Amino acid sequence: MSVHGASNALVRADAAKEFAADVQYYLTLNPRQLPSRYLYDALGSALFDAICRLPWYGITRTEARMLEAHGREVFDRLDRVSTIVELGSGDGSKLRLLVQSGAPRTRPLTIHLVDVSSAALTSSARTLSELDDVAIVLHETTYEAGLDDLGAQPRPAGRRLAVFLGSNIGNFDAPGADEFLRAIRRGLALGDGLLLGADLVKPEDVLQLAYDDPLGVTAAFNRNLLVRINRELGGDFDLEAFEHRAIWNAAASRVEMHLAAKRAQRVRIRAAELDVQFETGERIWTESSYKYEPGQIVAMLESAGFQCAAQWIDDVDRFALTLVQAK
């Protein structure tokens, strides 16, 4: 296995400016918000990895089981896959399962890992180093920038398979999901594939435990966003003055994560040139996790320029893997 990655000093400098600009913009909205991608610094990625191991958060285990069971069929249906692009690399364990279960049809391979977290990229590359005849290229950047980079590169022979797992599609609202899926489609040629993992609608009590676990790991993950603002942008958030809340919005079919102020307070964020007055109970909306029905997933993908090749559903744990091809 070989691993390649470009120097990211300028990328990180631009990312710091973008972080400050986004904090300035989103914290002045009504309701106050922060983009969920900023949850995933090194500590945030480690905390999310811990969340995925909790008994109440079944997405990771269910998806891994399904990838192992259906990986060979994914590659059989596409045929001649030479390049895999994983958007959101995680720890690499699920992609490793997919590639291993698809052997021997998937060698040699070039795998492009796209993630904003350098820690996640390093972890994923380490996991995938166990694979033979695989070259790994790291892209420490946003999904959109990574897709643009790949679209500008010469294409090798064979098909390209984009992989977007972990129900990360659920972090987009409907217009955002459509725009993102169309961006993926633009980076693919006719017949290339996209494998999408998406969580299905579940009972409210199951979702509540998944997003507000009794051990407080998800709460720490959410509050770490304030830790990051304090550290990187010169903020003075009092971490004990905000509490994690997870709310099931049935009308919108989404779980919402918020940070709620437990008392009135004024927060200064120097790098964002921002002073924010929080009243008791006022919330910062940090993440949405939309849940779907199987038919909604297919319709969403077809609207973005794909045709369904296969869909596998776990009816017990309520999760779907959908394989589509660019049309």
Question: Model-found features: residue ranges?
Answer:
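Class I SAM-dependent methyltransferase Rossmann-like catalytic core
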Residues: 31-78
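Conserved beta-strand signature within the Rossmann-like core of class I S-adenosyl-L-methionine
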Residues: 186-201
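Substrate-binding/catalytic lobe of Class I Rossmann-like enzymes that use SAM or dcSAM, i.e.
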Residues: 208-290, 294, 298-304
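A short, conserved alpha-helix within the catalytic core of class I
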Residues: 171-183
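Conserved SAM-binding loop of SAM-dependent methyltransferases across substrates and taxa
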Residues: 91-106
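Conserved SAM/SAH-binding beta-strand->alpha-helix loop
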Residues: 114-119
